[in-house]
């Protein structure tokens, strides 16, 4: 959902599909407990169909908008989600440096000189991103 700072995940299945045939779910969880506020917010978010559908729609629209901005500057969409997008660009380090000068944080990868990952900007930061690109 892109709720900043909230870490909450789910594993949904039957006893058969979740039965450990290798590592158990507990092995994947690590030592981090789920915070009470995350449970409360997650419960509310999953119970509010109007909010959930509106959020899905907004995230999809924002991802398409970001794709349009980056591809107009020569980037090519490689993949991603509605929260993060992965692009192939000519020089990812140069793009990252240019974006950082405008306080826009991105991620590059040590195994690819051309991959750049961007998250969706806050609604009032689109102009800043457009200017940086």
List where the protein language model places each region.
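Short loop segments at secondary-structure junctions
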Residues: 13-17, 89-92, 123
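Conserved PLP-binding catalytic core of the aspartate aminotransferase-like
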Residues: 59-60, 64-102, 120
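PLP-dependent enzyme catalytic core of the Aspartate aminotransferase-like
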Residues: 97, 101, 111-133
């Amino acid at each position: 959902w892109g709720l900043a700072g909230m870490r909450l995940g789910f594993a949904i299945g039957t006893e058969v599909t979740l039965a450990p045939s290798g590592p158990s779910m507990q092995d994947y969880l690590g030592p981090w407990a789920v915070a009470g506020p995350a449970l409360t917010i997650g419960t509310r978010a999953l119970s509010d169909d109007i909010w959930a559908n509106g959020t899905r729609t907004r995230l999809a629209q924002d991802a398409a908008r970001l794709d349009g901005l980056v591809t107009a500057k020569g980037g090519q969409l490689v993949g991603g989600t509605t929260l993060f997008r992965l692009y192939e660009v000519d020089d990812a380090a140069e793009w990252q440096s240019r974006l950082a000068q405008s306080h826009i944080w991105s991620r590059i990868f040590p195994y690819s000189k051309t991959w750049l990952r961007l998250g969706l900007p806050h609604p009032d930061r689109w102009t800043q991103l457009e200017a940086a690109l």
